[in-house]
């Protein structure tokens, strides 16, 4: 696992080096705090994440909240036990620093004992969606 973590971290650092932070931050602000970084990570880096999504598929919990969302999710506990690559990306110090700089605010990981600290959301069926919303933190800060 340590080798996987170091490998993913190295690739995240490499990807960040290719991003124009000033321009990306401008786009982020101009687009109501939303930005897409096409091909941020190379396909060989993404492939382990996709394999893990396949492993996690049986753990998808589907739900529907009228007017808000319809889709599925996989819990943090399943990710911790079955998806080391996804977890390494979530915990990447380089990614956290980059995102903090992008949004111009300090970001932190949620505590390990919070079952909602990291989840995989799956919008795979016709009609799946998520409405506009703002997630607030239950911890100190925003």
Region spans (language model):
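Non-heme Fe(II)/2-oxoglutarate
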Residues: 2-8, 12-101
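Catalytic core of non-heme Fe(II) oxygenases with the double-stranded beta-helix
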Residues: 85-87, 96-142
């Amino acid at each position: 696992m340590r080798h996987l973590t170091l490998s993913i971290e190295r690739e995240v650092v490499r990807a960040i080096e290719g991003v124009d932070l000033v321009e990306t931050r401008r786009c982020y602000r101009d687009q109501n705090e939303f930005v897409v970084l096409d091909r941020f990570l190379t396909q060989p880096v993404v492939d382990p994440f996709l394999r893990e999504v396949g492993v996690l598929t049986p753990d998808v919990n589907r739900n529907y909240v009228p007017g808000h969302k319809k889709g599925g999710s996989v819990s943090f506990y399943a990710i911790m036990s079955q998806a080391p690559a996804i977890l390494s990306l979530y915990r990447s110090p380089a990614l956290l620093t980059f995102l903090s700089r992008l949004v111009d605010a300090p970001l932190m990981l949620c505590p390990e004992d919070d079952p909602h600290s990291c989840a995989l959301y799956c919008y795979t069926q016709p009609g799946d969606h998520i409405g506009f919303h703002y997630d607030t933190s239950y911890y100190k800060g925003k």
